[in-house]
């Protein structure tokens, strides 16, 4: 599953949320799929929500209809109200900020390029991280670091994320997907 809006640093639009939601449904329903790899195009994992696109008016009407039909679709896409029954591996390059860090927390195995950066930048904009981080992050890393990230928008490097257990592997930049595929081969 590739988040593919590199010109927007893979910021999540309503259309992308629908597409990711549908990918999770396919993963669960297709017996030929044994696991998934979530990555981003163009050297960035995901920079969060595209706040301009979220205002509406720019998306395909069929996608907007689906968002209206399934009220928590965006939470399911971000793996907040959804837990795929098969393993999900994250292959992170570059930024995993805001919604990028939130969806990351719903994955099972996490690989990152050595210059990747993680963080919940919502507090810096006067926003609240609604994708589940207030619960999941403090369960996955030490409470004091989770609190600092949640309250201040502090960013952490790949090295620090590895030290605290937010990710499991660091590789040379440009090789996260390759490592994720190696892990997927062992699973499948």
Q: Where are the predicted features?
A:
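Well-ordered beta-strand positions
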Residues: 109, 148, 152-154, 160, ...
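An acidic, glycine-rich surface segment that forms the CoA-thioester-binding/catalytic face
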Residues: 17-21, 25-29, 51-93, 135, ...
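Glycine-rich beta-to-alpha active-site loop
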Residues: 77-125, 155
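C-terminal long alpha-helix characteristic of the crotonase
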Residues: 6, 111-116, 167-188
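Hydrophobic/aromatic residues within transmembrane alpha-helices
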Residues: 38, 50, 103-105, 161, ...
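Conserved CoA-thioester-binding segment of acyl-CoA-metabolizing enzymes
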Residues: 1-41, 55-57
């Amino acid at each position: 599953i590739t988040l593919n809006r590199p010109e927007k640093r893979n910021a999540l639009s309503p259309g992308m949320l629908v597409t990711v939601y549908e990918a999770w449904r396919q993963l669960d329903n297709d017996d030929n799929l044994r696991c998934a790899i979530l990555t981003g195009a163009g050297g960035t994992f995901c920079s969060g929500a595209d706040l301009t696109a979220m205002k509406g008016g720019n998306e395909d009407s069929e996608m907007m209809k689906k968002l209206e039909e399934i009220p928590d679709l965006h939470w399911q896409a971000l793996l907040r109200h959804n837990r795929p029954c098969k393993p999900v591996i994250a292959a992170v390059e570059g930024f995993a900020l805001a919604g990028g860090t939130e969806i990351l927390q719903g994955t099972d195995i996490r690989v990152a390029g050595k210059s990747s950066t993680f963080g919940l930048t919502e507090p810096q904009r006067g926003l609240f991280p609604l994708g589940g981080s207030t619960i999941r992050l403090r369960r996955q890393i030490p409470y004091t670091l989770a609190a600092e990230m949640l309250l201040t928008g502090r960013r952490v490097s790949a090295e620090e994320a590895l030290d605290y257990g937010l990710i499991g592997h660091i590789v040379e930049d440009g090789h996260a997907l390759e490592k994720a595929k190696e892990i997927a081969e062992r699973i499948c």
